[in-house]
């Protein structure tokens, strides 16, 4: 069986919230983006089954309280520099999700995604992100199992196969996001 060869600027592997958000940001930078998903985009990931709740400095929750809560929950082994970035950006990044069609309910120190239901509370996050990513030109490679990364010292692509028909695929990319 022949190998299908695809080239792109940015290959993103995984269609959970992180992969979708990364694909949207890369596309906003004007590059060609290919999002590879092992099933239909946005279906088989932890984000869709998440509770759809986030902590951030909203209402009476200050950034200092958010920082302390996060460090305590992490049993003091967190990378405090990364926690500072999280605390500084959490509220604005959560509000930014509304630009992509995500409906939010914001309370004191928390933010919940609406439009999800058990067992897929995170559907209210994932489905709008998939829709937005498609609308801005993110290309989707669905039902594709990525089995290996390409490159020696520097990753410049990946290989895998279509889970439905067995077709093999090789993807060349200037950047790869896992």
What name fits each language-model region?
Residues 62-66, 171-178:
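Short coil-to-beta-strand
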Residues 10, 17, 159, 171, ...:
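Mobile, glycine-rich extracellular loop/lid and propeptide segments
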